[in-house]
Each structure stands twice: as structure tokens, then as C-alpha cells.
């Protein structure tokens, strides 16, 4: 249980807590985002994505967001994205590279997975932090993400998974999630 500020009713508090908590853990706790850095948020118009855009902007980051329609791109801008890219109309990775003058992004909050994760590696800055925060592209797509060790090593890139649902890995089975045993 958490204390709720008086300005929130219970429904608003519940709707606020999850997306902003996930965004905070992804960007700040795991991603180490600092003021002045550039962050890429995939799925910037969704619940966690829009929270990540707002949080990153509030922390003083330059924010690039991707979304899948003109209306969603505009929504990302209204949430504070400095640059919003419609991933369905072209090569979003080229647009990110241009926007960063080929330097890349310091932190990426990947809420999509799969091929998006693979392409995100193209736009990571040296020493960047790639946060695998969701899989709106489908959980099966996660297994198709081409994370090449050479790219990670030579780019000095950190890759981390972010999952808030269960703090204790031993509790996964109790929640109906069955992990593949490690051999």
C-alpha cells in the first residue's frame, strides 16, 4: 500500500502509479538518466511511454519519442517530446541518427521489443543504456531481437530488463508465469 496525495482519487492514483513507476525505474534507477542527456522512448504515446516522455523532460533530458500515427506523434509532442517520429512512415533509426548528429542516444526506453530493439542498437551512443521495458510488439518478438554481443561490447552499451510486476523471482510461478529453467 502507498500513501496517496489528497489531490488524487483512488482511480487516478492507481492510473498514475504504475506507468510513472515503470518509467522511473527504467530511466532513473536502471538507466541512470542525467540532465542534458538524450533519451529515446519507443511507444511514446502509450501509458508508460507518455510517462517516460514527461519524466525524462522533467529531469532535463532531450527527449525523442516514436509513435505509430500522426495523432500519436502530436500527443508525444504535447507531453514534452522535443522530437517525435512516426515509425510507420520511414526509417525512424535514420531520423534518430540525424537528430543526434550520429552521436546516438544515451538512454533508450524500449517498450516495443523485437526488431525495434535490434534497430535501437544502431542509435545507441557510446556508453549508452538500453532499457528493455516492455514488449508491445508481442512477447514472441522479444526472442527475435538481435542483440549482438560485439555491438554491446564495442559500444560499451549496458542492456537491462525492467519488470516491476514481481520483485521476487521465486514468486513468478505463483503468479502464473512459468520461466524456462536455466541449464
Report the location of each language-model feature.
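Redox-cofactor binding/interface segments in oxidoreductases and associated redox assembly factors
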Residues: 41, 86, 110, 131-132
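Phosphate-coordination loops involved in phosphoryl transfer and adenosine-cofactor binding
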Residues: 35-37, 105, 156
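Mid-domain Rossmann-like dinucleotide-binding core that forms the NAD(H)/NADP(H) cofactor-binding site
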Residues: 13-90
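Short SAM/SAH-binding signature in class I
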Residues: 103-109, 128-129
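Structural detector of well-ordered beta-strand residues that form the stable sheet scaffold
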Residues: 2, 40, 64, 129-131, ...
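Glycine-rich phosphate-binding loop and adjacent beta-alpha segment
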Residues: 115-182
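Short amphipathic alpha-helix with an adjacent loop that forms part of the alpha/beta core around
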Residues: 91-102
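A generic alpha-to-beta junction signature in SAM-dependent methyltransferases
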Residues: 33, 100, 124-125
Amino acid at each position: 500500500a502507498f500513501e496517496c496525495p489528497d489531490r488524487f482519487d483512488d482511480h487516478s492514483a492507481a492510473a498514475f502509479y504504475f506507468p510513472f513507476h515503470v518509467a522511473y525505474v527504467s530511466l532513473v534507477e536502471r538507466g541512470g538518466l542525467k540532465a542534458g542527456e538524450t533519451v529515446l522512448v519507443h511507444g511514446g504515446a502509450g501509458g508508460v511511454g507518455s510517462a517516460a516522455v514527461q519524466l525524462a523532460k522533467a529531469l532535463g533530458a532531450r527527449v525523442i519519442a516514436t509513435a505509430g500515427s500522426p495523432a500519436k506523434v502530436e500527443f508525444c509532442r504535447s507531453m514534452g517530446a522535443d522530437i517525435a517520429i512516426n515509425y510507420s512512415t520511414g526509417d525512424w533509426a535514420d531520423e534518430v541518427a540525424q537528430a543526434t548528429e550520429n552521436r546516438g542516444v544515451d538512454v533508450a526506453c524500449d517498450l516495443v521489443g523485437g526488431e525495434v530493439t535490434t534497430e535501437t542498437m544502431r542509435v545507441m551512443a557510446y556508453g549508452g543504456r538500453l532499457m528493455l521495458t516492455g514488449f508491445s510488439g508481442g512477447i514472441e518478438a522479444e526472442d527475435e531481437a538481435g542483440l549482438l554481443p560485439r555491438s554491446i561490447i564495442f559500444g560499451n552499451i549496458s542492456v537491462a530488463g525492467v519488470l516491476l510486476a514481481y520483485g521476487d523471482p521465486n514468486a513468478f510461478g505463483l503468479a502464473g508465469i512459468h520461466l524456462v529453467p536455466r541449464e
